[in-house]
Amino acid sequence: MAEGGGGSRRRAPALLEAARARYESLHISDDVFGESGPDSGGNPFYSTSAASRSSSAASSDDERERPAPPGTAPPSYAADPLELEEDETGGGWSAVLRDRPSPRFEDTGGPTRKMPPSASAVDFFQLFVPDNVLKNMVVQTNMYARKFQERFGSDGAWVEVTLAEMKAFLGYVISTSVSHCESVLSIWSGGFYSNRSLALVMSQARFEKILKYFHVVAFRSSQTTHGLYKVQPFLDSLQSGFDAAFRPSQTQVLHEPLIDEDPVFIATCTERELRKRKKRKFSLWVRQCSSTGFIIQIYVHLKEGGGPDGLDALKNKPQLHSMVARSLCRNAAGKNYIIFTGPSITSLNLFEEFEKQGIYCCGLLSSRKSDCTGLPPSMLTNPATPLARGQHQIRTKGNMSLICWYNKGHFRFLTNAYSPVQKGVIIKRRSGEIPCPLAVEAFAAHLSYICRYDDKYSKYFISHKPNKTWQQVFWFAISIAVNNAYILYKMSDAYHVKKYSRAQFGERLVRELLGLEDSSPAH
């Protein structure tokens, strides 16, 4: 039997220092946005998606803490011999633990291009949205305007858009990520959200005309069946920019980022306004570097309508999420990445498939939300004997370890990235240190960082809410591009010339796109 005792909550200083040193690579951590605020870092198993957050208890089968009596060691848990025999003979799972090293990773993560100290906010943004992409938007928008007027009648007020106007148009919409005002037209309103310096660059009437005809892809080709055909070329271009500009660290996270409504807006919205709003028809998944927060890859899944990938025919959520994971990791093979996953993605079959490709995983497991095929049943049910905080059981099969760890509830993990023998510790400000396997410590550290990042980064999503799905996807993608640009800025020499917070960087980017600022952050 593999088991661990809770022991004293206070560990030796050397163990705590070693635990902290293991995650020094989370080097821009809380300061990633140059400001502090409340976050969700206190809960290492917090889920970043609203849907998952509402059912986060699914990952733990018992939220009641059962502490050991004061002054006594936590009770050991003895597995039933019949259960142990079933595990070993039924599916190849064993209670024998063997140490093994974590996957080697020799690549150097970070920006691939050294930006000069004089690089401006727009220089970083245009690593992902360069002029050739903007020029294509100009061509497609003008083409759509001509065809629209051929069909519905001439628009005497329309003049073909230029590259400078397209940049200004993007700048106006991006400004809503800083002002947190849902209506971009408020810039010209004269009210609280008005901005005279921005309003003078372009008239409201001209902005509304560009908004009316704005397109990334004007027309569907005869071979196109994808529901996102109007934005997919831009997503592909954005992905190429991400790949070219940044090399991720070894540890990464697959999840749904926070892209739900601004809680401040919801709190001030009338019931009628809320009823009029349409729910999103898509879900957005990302693969994210857990050391920096840089989003490496985006996957958009349409919730309605058919598609060539056949995802809409899938009714089983774990199966759907496994396909999403495969898509997000299609460029990750052979690099010994360690991918952290939530319960809906975690499964033995997927992890074994990824291991054959040189991708290793560590995932939170839920008997209700995960695909538990091939896992020993005795490890998926709570033991009859209460466990003390920090106690755990482990079963292994090849390189795979199934962990059941107790901390105010039973948490289960599946991993082939960490040795089942290596020990770790969860450091809590109030309750001290809680012993755990190294895989649990790693999961908590990296997921907590991503949660803190998302709590802050979600504040800077573009607030403009178009009705068309492809436009919603487009502006969410632009929001991600701006956040990624800020991360590259913080890792560059330009940050040491002028240290902008995330809000200041956004304001600077808007003014540069509108042509109101010099391109050098030194001025």
From Swiss-Prot:
Phosphoserine carried by residues: 520
Leftover remarks: Has been domesticated very early in vertebrate evolution, approximately 500 million years ago, in the common ancestor of cephalochordates and vertebrates.
Localization per record: Nucleus
Keyword Kinase: no
Name of the protein: PiggyBac transposable element-derived protein 5
EC number: 3.1.-.-
Record keywords, A-Z: Endonuclease, Hydrolase, Nuclease, Nucleus, Phosphoprotein, Transposition
Function: Transposase that mediates sequence-specific genomic rearrangements.
Transmembrane domains' residue ranges: none
Region (Disordered) location: 30-116
A GO CC term assigned to this protein in UniProt: nucleoplasm
Pfam family name, one: DDE_Tnp_1_7
UniProt GO molecular function: endonuclease activity; transposase activity
Ranges of biased composition (kind: Low complexity): 47-59
Principal subcellular localization: nucleus
Native species: Mus musculus (Mouse)
Composition skew (Basic and acidic residues), residue ranges: 97-107
GO BP annotation list: non-replicative DNA transposition
